Amino acid sequence: MTSIVFMGTPQFSVPILEALVANDYQILAVVTQPDRKVGRKQVLQQTPVKEAAVRLDLPVFQPEKLSGSPELADVIALQPDLIVTAAYGQFLPTKLLEAAKIAAINVHGSLLPKYRGGAPIQYAVLNGDSEIGITIMHMAKKMDAGDMIEQASIPIEATDDTGSLFDKLSYVGRDLLLKTLPGIIAQTAPRTPQDEVQVTFAYNITKEQEQLDINQPAEQLLNQIRALRPQPGAWLAVNGQRTKIWQATVAETTTDQAAGVVVALNKKDFELAAGNGTVLKITEIQPAGKAKMPVQSYLNGVGKQLAVGQQVVVQDAE
């Protein structure tokens, strides 16, 4: 039986771990991020991978920082045949990668060499890509730079956002890993070096990237909204108030109004002029300090003071 140390953190990783157990791979340990306090009540929450590991009765390690930790030595001492990572969230020390008797493998959420880094799915949506995929790859000291074993792709639908693609890709990754593992174990699987000329990066989303720039075309704004959903959410400064935009469409109409001006307003419509004469039609919104709401509820409450022709969006508000 092939022994594995599995490393992962979010829900994306859970179907992969469950499949390894179901297919009789020996999971020596699961390494995941520490429990974190979340929400206003600061409730201590386990990672989805820890919850799955506990349910599957697997040993769990949760170092705050893996490098130099006592847990690192414990994991290395397990001498696994394979290390399998899927969205773990920390760099792996070289001596850990070298501890795998056969290979250290990563399930990466992009079609490498495109989108190395921690936010490949977000960037694929942000950039309006037509497809996304999974790469099964060997791990290397350099971030996401190892040789590729196999890839699988799926289309990005207009209705997709980062959340839906995370869900879809977790199963694509699961199936592709199960398909490639026999060849990896037999050491007959292909190894294709990445073309460094084609490399792009998808670093973690910054706070600055959460703000929508109303001077951008509506299609780009919509991509940003989808890329930042379900969290952390994209926002506009509406009358100086940070207002999250959760659902929107690109209106069929165009306008000669300046970006940030209200161009349509009634019980069901809240349309803003965006860049290049385009119009963003907002359908779900979250004013500061409030819950998400349909735009109808917003216009009956907080948004009552808005008027057609009014410049309501100001950049760089806090």
UniProtKB/Swiss-Prot annotation:
Enzyme class: transferase
One GO cellular component term: cytosol
One Pfam family cited in the UniProt record for this chain: Formyl_trans_C
Keyword Protein biosynthesis attributed: yes
Gene3D superfamilies: Formyl transferase, C-terminal domain, Formyl transferase, N-terminal domain
Enzyme Commission number, as recorded: 2.1.2.9
Tree of life domain: Bacteria
Record's keyword terms, sorted: Protein biosynthesis, Transferase
GO molecular function term, any single one: methionyl-tRNA formyltransferase activity
Nucleotidyltransferase recorded as keyword: no
Binding-site positions, (6S)-5,6,7,8-tetrahydrofolate: 110-113
Catalytic activity, as annotated: L-methionyl-tRNA(fMet) + (6R)-10-formyltetrahydrofolate = N-formyl-L-methionyl-tRNA(fMet) + (6S)-5,6,7,8-tetrahydrofolate + H(+)
InterPro entries: Fmt (IPR005794), Formyl_trans_C (IPR005793), Formyl_trans_C_sf (IPR037022), Formyl_transf_N (IPR002376), Formyl_transf_N_sf (IPR036477), Formyl_transferase-like_C_sf (IPR011034), Met-tRNA-FMT_C (IPR044135), Met-tRNA-FMT_N (IPR041711)
The protein's role, per its UniProt record: Attaches a formyl group to the free amino group of methionyl-tRNA(fMet). The formyl group appears to play a dual role in the initiator identity of N-formylmethionyl-tRNA by promoting its recognition by IF2 and preventing the misappropriation of this tRNA by the elongation apparatus.
PANTHER family reported for this sequence: METHIONYL-TRNA FORMYLTRANSFERASE, METHIONYL-TRNA FORMYLTRANSFERASE, MITOCHONDRIAL
Family: Belongs to the Fmt family.
Name by which UniProt lists this protein: Methionyl-tRNA formyltransferase
Protein source organism: Latilactobacillus sakei subsp. sakei (strain 23K)
